């Protein structure tokens, strides 16, 4: 669960 990675989508 990486919120940073999700925000980079």
Curated annotation (Swiss-Prot):
GO CC annotation: what is one?
A: extracellular region
KW rRNA-binding (keyword) present:
no
- Transmembrane listed as a keyword: no
Q: Where in the cell is it found?
A: Secreted
User: Which keywords are on file for this protein?
Assistant: Neuropeptide, Secreted
- Which BP terms does GO give this entry? neuropeptide signaling pathway
Record function comment: FMRFamides and FMRFamide-like peptides are neuropeptides.
The family line of this record is:
Belongs to the FARP (FMRF amide related peptide) family.
Q: What is this protein called?
A: Extended FMRFamide-2
**Native species:** Pachyphasma brandbergense (Gladiator)
């Amino acid at each position: 669960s990486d919120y940073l990675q999700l925000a980079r989508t």
